[in-house]
Structures are given as structure tokens and as C-alpha cells.
UniProtKB/Swiss-Prot annotation:
This is Phosphoribosyl-AMP cyclohydrolase. Binds 1 Mg(2+) ion per subunit. The gene is hisI. Its EC number is 3.5.4.19. Pathway: Amino-acid biosynthesis; L-histidine biosynthesis; L-histidine from 5-phospho-alpha-D-ribose 1-diphosphate: step 3/9. Mg(2+) binds at residues 76, 78, 80. It comes from Ruthia magnifica subsp. Calyptogena magnifica. NCBIfam families: PRK00051.1. The keyword Kinase does not apply. SUPFAM superfamilies: HisI-like (SSF141734). It is found in: Cytoplasm.
Amino acid sequence: MDALKQTKFDDKNLIPAIVQDFKTGDILMFAWMNQESLALTIEKQQAVYYSRSRKKLWFKGEQSGHTQLIKEIFTDCDNDVILLRVDQVGGIACHTGRKSCFFQQLDKNNWKTVANVLKNPKDIYE
């Protein structure tokens, strides 16, 4: 696959991936991908990431059902960052039960929560 050859992975064979809601433009999350997860994402048109802590592929939504269907894939000018534009199934991207993982905003010198929990994580990950 030519796109994989053109993509610049780091020395750990990883590339950062920014995930954006296709309809709203909201940034949903950030994750890491390796060559295998990017290839699977392209092939299946569904987001697959690489979990650095678990050291394995992470099929987004495999436990929660909150999958990410790929609408478009971009890379930046250096080919070392991926942007996935997705249809977020269930409207929840974050394991905290929020739409986005970016729900804390700097307020003076403290992080302030600015987005509500849409679904209790205990109900998501039973």
C-alpha cells in the first residue's frame, strides 16, 4: 500500500492520530497508530489504534460499541501525523462517557470541566 510507505512513523513505529467528528468538526480524541493499525483502518474503514500501555491493537468501540466509521483520512505536510474524520457511533468518543476526550479547559491556572458526561462509564463498560 503506497500510503503506508509514504507515512512517516517514529522510531517506535508509531504515528499520532487526531480524530475529528466529520459532521461538526469537533476534535474527539488523540491516539497512536502503528503501521498495522493504520492499514486495518484503511482496509476496514473503521478506526483501529495501537495501545501503548497494553502493547496491542485497539479496535475503537470493541467494548463500548462506540466505533468510529472512517469518512476521510488526511496526513499533515510532513506525513507524520494522521487526521481521521469519522462518524462517531453513539456520539461518545471518550472512555469517561463524554463526546470528546477534550473536555477540560484551562481557566486561569486550573483545568475546568466544560462538558457533561453523556453516559456513565460503568454503564458503558459492564
